[in-house]
């Protein structure tokens, strides 16, 4: 708090006890979950008959949804942009207002809620268009690969989030507000992509409302 010793607070014992309690409760929850839920182990993989759909662990299914549209942008381009953007936030955000507080800075909680609504609406709209109408490859089979790589649901979604963040920075005249908006959109988008990849993708990575709708082999 501040820069001088008179405006500081000791980490011991209050912060240390709080962090230790959270760590112990998290560990206890993970252990209880591991005991209560069995791992979904299947038969030994057969390289001659690959699984369809072959899905990554659930925490990678958001990325797999992006990779389904473009291997390069989904697997390398967009993750690199996200990591670089998150890494730059501490260097770009030099504001002191709201430091150390949840939803601190201009906008506060209303900004987070508005950003969450935009983030959810954007990813749902982009995915709905891709599922209902297809994308460039379906519209134009002879389209060059560079166009498929540059313009796909993942890049469109990234652009929408970036433009919303820039608009937020200008509206609130605050880099922190833009960073908060961008991070909120990223979390909402990744959550929706993970849910879609987990529950609504079937054979050949086609969209199905339920596994009961999958074609019979």
Regions found by a protein language model. Name each.
Residues 1-4, 10-99, 103-136, 144-217:
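Hydrophobic cores of alpha-helical transmembrane segments in multi-pass integral membrane proteins
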